[in-house]
Curated annotation (Swiss-Prot):
Lineage of origin: Bacteria, Pseudomonadati, Pseudomonadota, Gammaproteobacteria, Enterobacterales
Residues that coordinate or bind a divalent metal cation: 246-247, 270
CC cofactor: Mg(2+); Mn(2+)
Protein name: NAD-dependent malic enzyme
The protein's Enzyme Commission number: 1.1.1.38
Organism: Cronobacter sakazakii (strain ATCC BAA-894)
The gene coding this protein: maeA
Length: 566
């Protein structure tokens, strides 16, 4: 079946009766007209009143408000999504700022941990190791022929929560909800997938309700052969699809990206998406301060694939914006992990970490307490302007470290990006109080505004949802065949151009979520234009690209149905 979304055109539907009501992509519930009820054998299967989508959304909102806990609200919204997707997205559109933290971080973390417990209905595709020889058949079982975006995880590193096994499916479902709500990509074009290669989470293995394959994780050559087979099956079924890798473990995330980025249109959101939104935030913050990012010194706490991905994107921008050499740019970036500052004499570094070391000889003048150079040592000696946390460990940005940074930096930029909120390196409340309100703070999860000395500071959420929906829309609209680093930087710059702090001199460094659909369209244009310039998409006029973006932007509105046969 192929569902085409052309605005204001009727849809020809081969389903009727209870089958139609059970199809979330097509179900309108009480909004089916009397004519449609007659034509599709729905008479008597629905209450008498024909409602508008806004009337349905108002009822759903009131029901949503009755739930007391975030996880119950999440379950309720997922039930609507699995019943009537158009209503689900209209509800999100009406209340995005309230509902985004419910459908995604931080609440989605709890939903992943409790996936088997709260499971109601299948969504997406589950490919398990025991079924590895049936991948082609499994993907053929998906009834939608024109899938355009896949988000896939193996559940091994879910947010900051670690191995959640099959429970990691909550992440692709949540991410794709944002592709639609923020980026206008039709839900009919999206597919969440989990690769179930077992779990090393003993709690899950012992849980009688756990729905995944009960076996320790498959690793090494067998694991990579499994993913190879998956990629080939996807290419055969949907050769032009955009594939997003999500929440793979550090040891696999970068190797998988490097292995497939020239074979299929793909990117890793934890590495490249996080890097793009962080870079966009830093570009805007630097411009608001009247400086360039290439003039700043930056310290990272966390040298995994996400932290190193952000660092590499920043270094590339420094070369582009400030004309720095690669060596000059790398000298301004300091990576700290649990063993201390990464230096060129450290053993057992991963390949992507070894490119980001500081030369030990250049640190001879530093005042340090031991051979292992701590985060405090780095802050005291390097005197950074920017501190970024991607460690997944709470409380590591201590009062001493933040105050030390503020001694030499009047307006420090502090970004504790770890998710969920329980893993944040420091809270905005503490950071702003330790700096007397001077710090510019952006976080990975949502936080309430903070009041310091009778002044209230809104907290920017450095959320990947500002970036990946627009990237997806741009790739679909331009027909891009690959995702390049330059396309990611174009997305960052487009995001920075929407900063209220830059454009008005006040407010947040990132735009409000109420603007996110327009932000996504502008990012899509920048990404599509760069794809054309780099030869990974067919060149068109700017007007044609803009038109394609508008035509591809799906809106949660009911359309009239006409009956047809399969």
């Amino acid at each position: 079946m192929e569902i085409k979304h052309k605005k204001n055109r009727s849809l020809y539907i081969p389903y009727a009766g209870p089958v139609l009501l059970e199809f979330p992509l097509l179900n309108k519930g009480s909004a089916f007209s009397m004519e449609e009820r007659s034509n599709f054998n729905l008479l008597g299967l629905l209450p008498e009143v024909v409602e508008t989508i806004e009337e349905q959304a108002e009822r759903a909102w009131r029901q949503f408000e009755d739930f007391k806990t975030d996880i119950d609200k999440h379950i309720y919204l997922r039930n609507i999504q699995d019943t009537n997707e158009t209503l689900f997205y209209r509800l999100l559109e009406n209340h995005l700022e309230v509902m985004m933290p419910i459908i995604y971080t931080p609440t989605v973390g709890s939903a992943c941990e409790r996936f088997s417990e709260i499971y109601r209905r299948a969504r997406g595709v589950f490919i398990s190791w025991p079924n590895r020889h049936n991948m082609d058949d499994i993907l053929q079982n998906v009834p939608i022929h024109n899938i355009k975006v896949i988000v896939v995880t193996d559940g091994e590193r879910i947010l900051g929560l670690g191995d959640q096994g099959i429970g990691g499916m909550g992440i692709p479902i949540g991410k794709l909800s944002l592709y639609t709500a923020c980026g206008g990509i039709s839900p009919a074009y999206t597919l969440p997938i989990v690769l179930d290669v077992g779990t090393n989470n003993q709690q899950l293995l012992n849980d009688p309700l756990y729905m995944g394959w009960r076996h320790p994780r498959i690793t090494d050559d067998e694991y990579y052969a499994f993913v190879d087979d998956f990629i080939q099956a996807v290419k055969q079924r949907w050769p032009n699809v955009l594939l997003q890798f999500e929440d793979f473990a550090q040891k696999n995330a970068m190797p998988l990206l490097e292995r497939y980025r020239d074979e299929i249109c793909c990117f890793n959101d934890d590495i490249q998406g996080t890097a793009a939104v962080t870079l966009g935030t830093l570009i805007a913050a630097s411009r608001a301060a009247g400086s360039q990012l290439s003039e700043q010194k930056i310290v990272f706490l966390g040298a995994g694939s996400a932290g190193c991905g952000i660092a590499e994107q920043i270094i590339a921008w420094m070369r582009t914006e400030g004309g720095l050499s690669d060596e000059q740019a790398r000298a301004r970036v300091f990576m700290v992990d649990r063993f201390g500052l990464l230096t060129d004499n450290m053993p057992n570094l991963l390949s992507f970490q070894s490119k980001l070391v500081q030369k030990r000889d250049s640190l001879k003048g530093w005042d340090t307490q031991s051979d292992s150079i701590s985060l405090l040592d780095v802050v005291r000696n390097a005197k950074p302007d920017i501190l970024i946390g991607v460690s997944g460990q709470t409380g590591l940005f201590t009062e001493e470290i933040i105050r030390e940074m503020h001694k030499h930096c009047a307006r420090p930029i502090v970004m504790p990006l770890s998710n969920p909120t329980s893993r944040v390196e420091a809270t905005p409340h503490d950071i702003l109080n330790w700096t007397d309100g001077a710090a510019l703070v952006a976080t990975g999860s949502p936080f309430q505004p903070v009041t310091v000395k009778e002044k209230t500071y809104p907290i920017a959420q450095c959320n990947n949802a500002y970036i990946f929906p627009g990237i997806g829309l741009g790739i679909i609209s331009s027909g891009a065949l690959r995702v390049t680093d330059e396309m990611m930087m174009a997305a960052s710059e487009a995001l920075a151009s929407h900063s209220p702090l830059v454009n008005t001199g006040s407010g947040l460094v990132l735009p409000p979520l109420t603007d996110i659909q327009q932000v996504s369209k502008d990012i899509a244009f920048a990404v599509g234009k760069m794809a054309q310039q780099q030869g990974v998409a067919v060149k068109t006029s700017a007007e044609a690209l803009l038109q394609a973006i508008e035509e591809n932007f799906w809106l949660p509105e009911y359309r009239s149905y006409r009956r047809t046969s399969i």
